[in-house]
Amino acid sequence: TRYTRSPYDPHRIETCSIQKGEWVMVNSKKASGIWVSDSSSKEEGSSQPKGDSLSRRKPSQDRSKERMEKILAAAEACILEMGAANLKISDIAAASGMANASVYQYFSNREEIIQALLERYLDYFYEQNTQLLGPVDSVEAFLIYLEDVVYGYHDYVKSNATYRAIWMDSQGWAELRAIDRKDNIRLAHAWVEKVMEFVPDLKADMAPNVFLTCIETGAHMTRVSVEIGGRVERIMMDEMIAMVRGHLSTFLRDH
């Protein structure tokens, strides 16, 4: 068994075993629980080495990068098994085959590891969204793009247990929400730049907030619908998309 990147999604790290050239996925488990910070209390016998925080910044040497990747892969596997709320540095160290002290050389606590994983997911979403945005050249094309983005995000949330666990177990964590909001603002500004190409008189002072509201509403409702599941899930998705599409259609066509 080893931790590696998916051959299908370069931004997703998976736990796999290779048998006769085949990839065998580890079964995902739905996570539940309440996020409890461990930044103030480390596990017994795993005291954090002293040192400047600069030593934990992204390493430049290939070997160090590989070890960081190994830690993140192990963390994702642990989250799949026990949820983000129960994640411990000692479990990550054991899963990666490294000592606790070695993990602390790269991350000062589990919160930093969770943040690193989330930032990877968000970078992946942003890259996919901006690629889809490239050929958009009209209001109608933008609204179709919007539907594709929302349904694509829904499928990702539904199929990626690790991403789902991070969000469902850590909604009370302000730092995580701040990272997400910063990424949403980044996407909103990308929308403004694109839409101004075919709506030159777009109200640039209003558009970022309008787009940001639509992005955050869509993301939140998507995650809630996945948690509810069943027939209600589809109803919520369809109604949310109709609402956001209608709001944006009115805003853009008023120019």
Predicted regions and their residues:
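Basic, helix-initiating cap at the start of DNA-binding domains
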Residues: 4-7, 13-82, 91, 95
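Helix-turn-helix
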Residues: 70, 78-112, 116
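Short hydrophobic clusters on alpha-helical segments that form packing/core surfaces
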Residues: 71-79, 121, 125, 153, ...
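Alpha-helical DNA-contacting segments of helix-turn-helix folds
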Residues: 114-121, 128, 183, 187
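Short secondary-structure transition hinges
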Residues: 139-144, 159-189
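Hydrophobic/aromatic-rich alpha-helical bundle segments in the mid-to-C-terminal region
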Residues: 197-244, 255
